[in-house]
């Protein structure tokens, strides 16, 4: 039974998305349906957490919009996420960056990872 579930999940997992980590700044292209029209909206921010794994994996992106912190959680394998672009790679020592919620301005910056 478990093998059947794993097989179904394996065929539905997306492989076209880049590998990104917590701390990276990403642009998430999301399909939004308004009535009969469908458009793509871009949400750019820092990945502050990744949760679960496999087909149920989600990630949360945080950004400041007009001085107000906005967080959105996206399923990694959802068809509404059309594309994920990595803007810059961040260097962090935590799996969850909730401390960024209390910081404003330059204090909320994440160091860049160099390769």
Swiss-Prot record:
Gene3D superfamilies noted in UniProt: 2.30.30.790
Protein function: This protein is located at the 30S-50S ribosomal subunit interface and may play a role in the structure and function of the aminoacyl-tRNA binding site.
Pfam families named in the record: Ribosomal_L19
Top-rank taxon, per record: Bacteria
Gene that specifies this protein: rplS
Keywords, sorted A to Z: Ribonucleoprotein, Ribosomal protein
GO terms, molecular function: structural constituent of ribosome
PANTHER family: LARGE RIBOSOMAL SUBUNIT PROTEIN BL19M (PTHR15680:SF9), RIBOSOMAL PROTEIN L19 (PTHR15680)
Naturally occurring in which organism (per UniProt): Clostridium tetani (strain Massachusetts / E88)
InterPro entries documented for this protein: Ribosomal_bL19, Ribosomal_bL19_CS, Ribosomal_bL19_sf, Translation_prot_SH3-like_sf
Family according to the record: Belongs to the bacterial ribosomal protein bL19 family.
Membrane-crossing residue ranges in chain numbering: none
Gene Ontology biological-process annotations: translation
Taxonomy of the source species: Bacteria, Bacillati, Bacillota, Clostridia, Eubacteriales
Name of the featured protein: Large ribosomal subunit protein bL19
GO terms for cellular component: cytosolic large ribosomal subunit
